[in-house]
Amino acid sequence: DISKDAQEGPTEFVWPPARDLPGYRLPGKPNQRRLAQAAEVISAAERPVLYLGGGLNRAQVPTEDLTELVELIGAPFVTTLTALDVMPSEHPLNLGMPGMHGTVAAVGALQRADVVVCLGARFDDRVTGRPDTFATKASVIHVDVDPAEISKIRTADVPIVGDLADVVPALSTEFRDHVAADGRADIAPWRGEVGRIQATYPTGWTDTDDGLLQPQEVITHLDRAASEDTIWVTGVGQHQMWSAHYLTFRRPHTWLTSAGAGTMGYGLPAAMGAKEACPDRPVWLIDGDGCFQMTNQEL
């Protein structure tokens, strides 16, 4: 224990001469053999799905690099709560968010997939539910900068440790070369199947009998009125899930939300920080009453 007077008293801090983090090393370039193995598995897949996570944002993977990989593979993709802005919401291969608050198409595609390519996500319980029932027919390719995340929840058939900014373009090159040499499986029937599910079960809401506005409708109108460079921020709760489904993202780094920790009260100070960092861009906070009351004194 540290005594209260020691906790509250002034002290002097001196930076150590070297910042040493024992037990952790930044990964080098991705393993070429693993990349080749991943390209082989993807090219043989008849029902592949790309599972895109927030690590793509944190690694600052260029949009053009990610778009090239997605369109080269041509598979439908899902985006986790922290990755909603890594690819345009209106991209024809985008199935939306997976998991317990996800779209029917995203959940259904993962459950039917024969290969899941996970880029910067962690197979958390809000996506998988019970891990032993998640995508049971799929081989898993898992890419992460942290080796401790790989095979932690779901065993990876092809583990790749590396910075996604390096892995994404390298995998594009490897996949293109493999297909040129050996061809690939036909995924047109799979894309058609997923497209039919998406068309049959769109995201929507039911109008109220008394004609009052639904929250989803309010968010939709706000989205239509906002400019493309708007930064969207939310608190945690139902309004967060409505925002995830009804906002349209067209560029990266336009979405701030508390996901894994799920911290109520996050929204207002985060929105103020976003505006301080980007004073020339509009910033909208969509918040709940409970979240707002937790930190409204920040104003």
Regions found by a protein language model. Name each.
Residues 192-280:
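Active-site diphosphate/adenylate-binding microenvironment
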Residues 34-50, 69, 110-113, 221-230, ...:
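Glycine-rich phosphate/diphosphate-binding loops that line cofactor/substrate pockets in enzymes
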Residues 26, 83-191:
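Glycine-rich, acidic loop regions that bind phosphate or pyrophosphate groups
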Residues 1-44, 202-205:
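Conformationally flexible catalytic loops at phosphate/diphosphate-handling active centers
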Residues 1-8, 81-84, 110, 120-142, ...:
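Conserved thiamine diphosphate
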Residues 107, 112, 150-161, 165-169, ...:
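Thiamine diphosphate
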Residues 1-7, 54-56, 147, 236-240:
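Glycine-rich beta-alpha junction loops
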